Structures are given as structure tokens and as C-alpha cells.
A protein has these predicted regions:
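Non-catalytic interaction-recognition regions
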Residues: 1-421
Length: 421
């Protein structure tokens, strides 16, 4: 994940996180070693824009007429950032000249405050990371230029350094990696970052999986080209693109945060509908599909809500096993009941599903499978007597197997599996 540390997380970031975290869980279940990483984009002009915005909002605490820079972040999140800065520094920087040194102070504060909130929101959302990599630190520790100097297909033009990404016909134009004024581009850092990650894996079969918003689709081929240009295999980097999301409520699009006047934040949405509902809905859709997140539908506690059906089936299985009272039931009898056979058939699909998702990265296959399994279990439950039946233990073993798979599938999505509802 790599949301800029310039504000609060929104629903688009949540889709990235939900897909990525679930994919990591599935890959680990399939036997892979997985490293979860957050790339902190703290090098570049967006950080200066944030610093300028916080400084202006801070000055407005003392002088409401203090102007906002035209090219700045005007959302209410910068007001909250400025208030947090004031809570620490009071009037220490009131009316100071806005020099480069002062900008660095506001920039550093903004980055740390944003990252702190991002980590908190992700943790509440059930997403944690093994590594945080700072882009600014990559430059400070000279980890960018060695890779850039090893590129084979660069050339100079108009004072800038270009990478010949049109070679092979997969990009529509060559790309600047170092501007004529000596500043590096975002692409420059991306080139070095991906090589560094592969080297850190220290595995000839290691693979990097990036998850990007579809608005970055134009970057895919140039990143893969640079990866190959450095001598790495193209199949060692996979870039998944996810489409945009609209938030809907009462049939209308919810565009704005009531508190901040910007995009609806993940924190606000989670408070309204809960993390489980967000995660399920975002994972249930193909990456390639634009989705409408309907707040009314995801909060329904009835048969119209797939997540509710799955959770209810798990709770039902737990309750039935409690009534049977056999701790480790063993299937010793042939199950000739058609509903039991259907349930067995569904359960047999689970290992193959895990293998398929680990190979294709299609985590959206998991929710419909769990829904199908839940419906098969509900039919079994409604049409089969378990308690006191002649083959009670075998039927109870089937119920327990269903409970285990439902719980495991929900766990892969970091969604609660309730024992009572």
C-alpha cells in the first residue's frame, strides 16, 4: 500500500488495503512467504503542498484572513493537522517568515501526523504491515541512483535524462527520469524501489505484487520495462489495478465528508457501517469493476446481505454443535442424505479454491464461494435432523467441517466469525 501521507485515508485506500491484506493471507495459506509493505510517499512536491497548507491553516488560528496558497490542500483535514500542530507548539510559529527551514518543520510534522493516523486507521481496519519504507529515506541513503546508473536504455535530451520505454512498442512515449533541473521524477524512485524490493527478497523465484488504482494504469508498462532493463524477469513483478468506488446512500452519491469537506474518510465510513461490511463488499467485487458502495445494503441484517448470511450460517453451525455436545465428532457412516452430499461437494471445492486464488490473485472468488457454502448449509440445516439421528456423529462431523471452512474463509478476509447471532 502507498497512500500519500498528506491527509486521512478514504474508501479508495480501503479497497487497496482490503484486497492486499486478503491476498497476503491467501498466499500464506497456500504456503508462500509474504512480506507486507507500506511505501511512504514522502518525497516530492505533494509534501511541500501539505506543509504550505498546514502553515496557512496554523496562521489562520491567529488571523482568520491569512490567505491559503492557491496550489494547496483546501480540505478540512489540513485544519485538523494545523490544530494538532498548535496543540504542541502554541504560538511559537505565529507570524514567522515562511523560510525553507520553517517549511521543513511543518512538512516533517505533517508527514508524521498523517502516517500516525494512517497506521491507526489501518490497524482498526485489520491491516498491519511488516515494513514501512520511506521514499525520502531511499534518497537520503543513496539507494536510488545505483539502480538508475545501471539502466541500459537511457539517453539525454533537452538537458533531461530519458528512459527509452517505447522500445518494444509497449509505451506510447519515452519517459523522463531526471528533469533538466536535476530533480528526479516519481518514476525514477519507482525504478529503484522495485529493484530494491526484489533484492531484499533474496529469492530467485521471489515476486513483487503491487496494487494500484486504475488511474495509474499508464505507469504499468514503463515500470515493467525498467524492471526488465535492469536485468530482472518480467514475471517477477505483478501489478493489479482496481477501479474507482462511489459511496451511495438512499439512492444518492455521498461525495463529501461532513466533517472535513473532502472525500468521505475511511474512519467516518467505518463508524457508520463497520469494518466487516466494508471489507466484505470491497473484496466481493472484481478489481476491474467500478463499484457503488451502498451504505443501506451493506448494513442490512437480512437475507439480502451476503455477509449476514455467511455469518449467520457460521453461528448456526456453532449453536448446533453445542447442542450435539460431541467435541470431536468423527464421520464413520455414509451420508446418503442429498443435502449432506451437496454440502460435502461444496466443502471439497475449498482447497482448490485457495490454490486458484493464490495463482490468479482473484480474491473476489472467496466471498461467492462462502455464500454458496452457507446456502448449502442452511438447506442441510432445514432439511436434516442431526440431534438424535442414527448417524448423529457423522452429521455433526459435517457440521463441524462446515464451521471450520466458514471461519477460515472469514479469517482470510479478516472478518469476524460470530458464534452467536
Amino acid at each position: 500500500m502507498s497512500a500519500n501521507p498528506t491527509g486521512y485515508l478514504h474508501i479508495g485506500h480501503a479497497r487497496n488495503a482490503a484486497i492486499g491484506a486478503t491476498l497476503c493471507n491467501i498466499l500464506e495459506k497456500a504456503g508462500h512467504r509474504v512480506v507486507r509493505e507500506y511505501l511512504v510517499n514522502d518525497y516530492g512536491n505533494q509534501m511541500n503542498k501539505m506543509a504550505d497548507s498546514i502553515f496557512a491553516r496554523y496562521q489562520q488560528i491567529f488571523n482568520p484572513e491569512f490567505p491559503m496558497p492557491e496550489d494547496s490542500y483546501h480540505g478540512g483535514d489540513m485544519i485538523e493537522f494545523a490544530q494538532a500542530f498548535y496543540n504542541i507548539h502554541k504560538d511559537e510559529y505565529k507570524n514567522v517568515e515562511y523560510t525553507d527551514e520553517i517549511r521543513k518543520i511543518f512538512r516533517s510534522f505533517g508527514r508524521d501526523f498523517a502516517l500516525k493516523n494512517i497506521i491507526e486507521d489501518m490497524k482498526k481496519f485489520g491491516v498491519t504491515f511488516d515494513i514501512f519504507t520511506s521514499e525520502a529515506e531511499q534518497y537520503a541513503k543513496n539507494r536510488v541512483w545505483p539502480a538508475i546508473h545501471r539502466l541500459k536504455t537511457t539517453y539525454k535530451k533537452d538537458g533531461a535524462t530519458w528512459l527509452e520505454t517505447t522500445k518494444g512498442g509497449k509505451d506510447d512515449k519515452d519517459r523522463v527520469i531526471i528533469k533538466s533541473n536535476g530533480d528526479s521524477t516519481y518514476f525514477c524512485a519507482d525504478i529503484a524501489y522495485h529493484e530494491q524490493k526484489l533484492l531484499e527478497l533474496n529469492d530467485p523465484n521471489g515476486k513483487i505484487v503491487d496494487i494500484w488504482g486504475a488511474d495509474h494504469s499508464g505507469y504499468v508498462e514503463r515500470v515493467k520495462f525498467s524492471f526488465e532493463d535492469l536485468g530482472h524477469r518480467r514475471d517477477q513483478i505483478e501489478i493489479l489495478l482496481f477501479q474507482l468506488i462511489r459511496i451511495m446512500k438512499n439512492g444518492k452519491e455521498v461525495k463529501m465528508s461532513k466533517r472535513l469537506g473532502t472525500s468521505l474518510t475511511l474512519r467516518e465510513l467505518a463508524e457508520e457501517v463497520g469494518n466487516d461490511a466494508i471489507r466484505y463488499f470491497l473484496i466481493d467485487r472484481s478489481y476491474n469493476s467500478r463499484i457503488d458502495f451502498d451504505i443501506n445494503k451493506v448494513t442490512d441484517n437480512n437475507e439480502n446481505n451476503p455477509m449476514y448470511i455467511i455469518k449467520y450460517a457460521h453461528a448456526r453451525a456453532c449453536q448446533l454443535l453445542d447442542k450435539v455436545g460431541i467435541e470431536n465428532p468423527i464421520a464413520s457412516d455414509e451420508l446418503d442424505n442429498e443435502y449432506a452430499q451437496k454440502l460435502v461437494a461444496e466443502l471439497k471445492e475449498y482447497p482448490e479454491l485457495i490454490s486458484t486464488m493464490a495463482k490468479t490473485y482473484k480474491v473476489n472468488l472467496l466471498p461467492p464461494y462462502l455464500l454458496k457454502l452457507s446456502k448449502a448449509f442452511n438447506s442441510f440445516y432445514s432439511n436434516t435432523k442431526v440431534l438424535g439421528s442414527p448417524n448423529e456423529q457423522s452429521l455433526a462431523a459435517l457440521v463441524k467441517a462446515t464451521k471450520i471452512v466458514l471461519a477460515d474463509g472469514l479469517k482470510l478476509m479478516d472478518i469476524e466469525a460470530p458464534e452467536k447471532m
